[in-house]
Amino acid sequence: MAKKITAFIKLQVKAGQANPAPPVGPALGQRGLNIMEFCKAFNAATSKLEPGLPTPVIITAYSDRTFTFVTKSTPASVLLKKAAGVSSGSKRPNTDKVGKVTRKQLEEIAKVKEADLTAAELEAAVRTIAGSARSMGLTVEG
């Protein structure tokens, strides 16, 4: 018989830097999950990613206090800010432009995000990422 699921916990943790401090500790501790076991497993799973990039993770907690987790790709906004070399998006994206991204950069970001996007083709994924860039106040070139 399958284990009973008690909770889904969604967090954003920096790749390779999970530790028992907030937000990880309190979120797992209140469910009675082993915090250090998660930290070690998460850090091992994200060891190939660039350290420090925020990585969304969905933790499934079971009634016997075990867990499984799935990592997602880094949010598009973080990748776009990094590509454009800006620290934050524009407060008024329609009038104030804060940076530029090229078509090539959009394609690279779309390839990274490909598994998490619903787009059927790379071109559709690029258009989705370009829309995110425009809504952040970035100019899309190409």
From Swiss-Prot:
<dbReference type="Pfam" id="PF03946">
    <property type="entry name" value="Ribosomal_L11_N"/>
</dbReference>
<dbReference type="GO" id="GO:0022625">
    <property type="term" value="C:cytosolic large ribosomal subunit"/>
</dbReference>
<comment type="similarity">
    <text>Belongs to the universal ribosomal protein uL11 family.</text>
</comment>
<comment type="subunit">
    <text>Part of the ribosomal stalk of the 50S ribosomal subunit. Interacts with L10 and the large rRNA to form the base of the stalk. L10 forms an elongated spine to which L12 dimers bind in a sequential fashion forming a multimeric L10(L12)X complex.</text>
</comment>
<dbReference type="InterPro" id="IPR020783">
    <property type="entry name" value="Ribosomal_uL11_C"/>
</dbReference>
<dbReference type="GO" id="GO:0070180">
    <property type="term" value="F:large ribosomal subunit rRNA binding"/>
</dbReference>
<comment type="function">
    <text>Forms part of the ribosomal stalk which helps the ribosome interact with GTP-bound translation factors.</text>
</comment>
<protein>
    <recommendedName>
        <fullName>Large ribosomal subunit protein uL11</fullName>
    </recommendedName>
</protein>
<dbReference type="InterPro" id="IPR006519">
    <property type="entry name" value="Ribosomal_uL11_bac-typ"/>
</dbReference>
<dbReference type="InterPro" id="IPR020785">
    <property type="entry name" value="Ribosomal_uL11_CS"/>
</dbReference>
<dbReference type="InterPro" id="IPR036769">
    <property type="entry name" value="Ribosomal_uL11_C_sf"/>
</dbReference>
<dbReference type="InterPro" id="IPR000911">
    <property type="entry name" value="Ribosomal_uL11"/>
</dbReference>
<dbReference type="Pfam" id="PF00298">
    <property type="entry name" value="Ribosomal_L11"/>
</dbReference>
<keyword id="KW-0699">rRNA-binding</keyword>
<keyword id="KW-0488">Methylation</keyword>
<dbReference type="InterPro" id="IPR020784">
    <property type="entry name" value="Ribosomal_uL11_N"/>
</dbReference>
<keyword id="KW-0694">RNA-binding</keyword>
<keyword id="KW-0689">Ribosomal protein</keyword>
<dbReference type="InterPro" id="IPR036796">
    <property type="entry name" value="Ribosomal_uL11_N_sf"/>
</dbReference>
<dbReference type="GO" id="GO:0003735">
    <property type="term" value="F:structural constituent of ribosome"/>
</dbReference>
<dbReference type="GO" id="GO:0006412">
    <property type="term" value="P:translation"/>
</dbReference>
<keyword id="KW-0687">Ribonucleoprotein</keyword>
